[in-house]
Every structure is written in structure tokens, then in C-alpha cells.
């Protein structure tokens, strides 16, 4: 199969973004994230959806949660335009998972498994370039010069939501809402659990084996 349809799931900090980028490049498919899809369709007319606002942009600018119905419509539009994809960041709950089943079939579902304490260490140690967004880590992905981005020379910062209290709250939200999605897909023929605590290269090797085995 030349253009696989891949879903990658896992908690914040599991490495979904890194491995999704690898998948998109290696298999020539589109990397679709909820955030990117929302930004690309922020002026979409949703006035017929009985929502508070008429466009996703208004929700985003107000800092309000975009309703599931709007997110579903935007993801559906993105998937309909993609010839093969890796979907990252959706579905976030069982209702969205049920909607996704009506949008497309999935060939492979990759679940990145990482322990909570490892996730806390990863996320609280993350540093992000304030200019270009490149990610670093205080332990295992340090810049050449402390506090300075290798790519653009910008300042490295800790995001406000990467402090320990916020991280643990985010993981609680994941456990409550998104972990049941992983259980939901457990019986899917293409479901593969990946040990996300390996090195990124080891994780990538295991992912390639899984995708190749389910899309041959």
C-alpha cells in the first residue's frame, strides 16, 4: 500500500509529533494535526452548526474550546483532501473516535506507551525556542550553547504549561478523555502498541516495522 492511513495516539510528551513527521516523510503522506487543521480553516463558515460563533477563528481568539462538531467537520475536510495521512491529536474522546469511523478507514493505529513519571520528566524539562519553535530538553536534547537555539539563535524558554503542576493536570485530562480512545481501538486489526520509552531511533524502527507489516 503506497499511501497508508495512519493514526498515532499517546499522551502529551510521548513523541507523537516527532514520529508523525518521520512517517510523513518516509511514506509520502500528509501529517494532519488538529491544531494545523483548525488554523488552516479558521475562517470556515460554521454559522449553520448552531454554534456560539460563526468561525473557528472567533473561538480561538476568545480562548474558548472549539466544539466537537466544528473540529469533526474540519478534520473530515482535511482527510478528504489527503492521499494517505498520519493523523496526530485527534480523536481526543470517544465521541470523536466514533465520528472518525464515519470519515475514513484506518490501516494502522500506533499507540505510544510511556509511563507517567517519564512523561513528567520529559515535559517539565522541555525548552522551546521563543522565535522558531524548535524543541530542546535540559537532559537529552541540549543546545550547543545553553539557553540559545541552534537553529536561529533565539532564546529558549519553558512554556507556561510545562511546569509540573500543569503537566500533571494535562496528563489527568488525557487519562480521563483520551485514554479510553486507545482502549476503543485495542481490537482493531491494525492496532500496535509501541514502547515509547526507547530512544527515538528505536521507536522509529519499531514503527516502521509495524506500518510495513500492516500495509504490505
Curated annotation (Swiss-Prot):
Binding residue positions for Zn(2+): 129, 132, 149, 152
EC top class, as a word: transferase
Keywords: ATP-binding, Cytoplasm, Kinase, Metal-binding, Nucleotide biosynthesis, Nucleotide-binding, Transferase, Zinc
A Pfam family that the UniProt record links to this protein: ADK
Reaction(s) catalysed by this chain's protein: AMP + ATP = 2 ADP
Superkingdom, taxonomy of origin: Archaea
The protein's annotated pathway: Purine metabolism; AMP biosynthesis via salvage pathway; AMP from ADP: step 1/1
Stored CDD domains: ADK
A GO term for molecular function: ATP binding
Residues reported to bind ATP: 13-18, 126, 198
EC numbers: 2.7.4.3
Main location: cytoplasm
InterPro entries cross-referenced by the UniProt entry: Adenyl_kin_sub, Adenylat/UMP-CMP_kin, Adenylat_kinase_CS, Adenylate_kinase_lid-dom, P-loop_NTPase
Function: Catalyzes the reversible transfer of the terminal phosphate group between ATP and AMP. Plays an important role in cellular energy homeostasis and in adenine nucleotide metabolism.
Similarity comment: family membership: Belongs to the adenylate kinase family.
Quaternary data: Monomer.
Domain notes: Consists of three domains, a large central CORE domain and two small peripheral domains, NMPbind and LID, which undergo movements during catalysis. The LID domain closes over the site of phosphoryl transfer upon ATP binding. Assembling and dissambling the active center during each catalytic cycle provides an effective means to prevent ATP hydrolysis. Some bacteria have evolved a zinc-coordinating structure that stabilizes the LID domain.
Name this polypeptide is given: Adenylate kinase
Origin organism lineage: Archaea, Methanobacteriati, Methanobacteriota, Stenosarchaea group, Halobacteria
Amino acid at each position: 500500500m503506497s499511501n497508508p492511513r495512519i493514526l498515532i495516539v499517546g499522551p502529551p510528551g510521548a513523541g507523537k509529533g516527532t514520529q508523525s513527521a518521520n512517517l510523513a516523510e518516509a511514506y509520502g503522506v500528509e501529517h494532519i494535526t488538529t491544531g494545523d487543521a483548525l488554523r488552516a480553516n479558521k475562517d470556515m463558515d460554521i454559522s449553520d452548526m448552531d454554534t456560539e460563533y460563526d468561525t473557528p477563528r472567533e473561538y480561538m481568539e476568545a480562548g474558548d474550546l472549539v466544539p466537537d462538531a466544528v473540529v469533526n467537520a474540519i478534520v473530515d475536510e482535511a482527510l478528504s483532501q489527503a492521499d494517505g495521512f498520519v493523523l496526530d491529536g485527534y480523536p481526543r474522546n470517544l465521541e470523536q473516535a466514533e465520528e472518525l469511523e464515519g470519515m475514513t478507514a484506518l490501516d494502522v493505529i500506533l499507540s505510544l506507551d510511556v509511563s507517567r513519571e517519564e512523561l513528567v520528566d520529559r515535559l517539565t524539562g522541555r525548552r522551546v525556542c521563543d522565535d522558531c519553535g524548535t524543541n530542546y530538553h535540559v537532559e537529552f536534547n541540549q543546545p550547543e550553547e545553553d539557553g540559545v537555539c541552534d537553529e536561529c539563535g533565539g532564546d529558549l524558554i519553558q512554556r507556561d504549561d510545562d511546569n509540573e503542576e500543569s503537566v500533571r493536570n494535562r496528563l489527568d485530562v488525557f487519562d480521563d478523555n483520551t485514554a479510553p480512545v486507545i482502549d476503543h481501538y485495542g481490537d482493531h486489526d491494525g492496532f500496535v502498541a509501541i514502547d515509547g520509552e526507547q530512544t527515538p531511533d528505536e521507536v522509529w524502527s519499531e514503527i516502521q516495522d509495524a506500518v510495513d507489516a500492516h500495509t504490505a
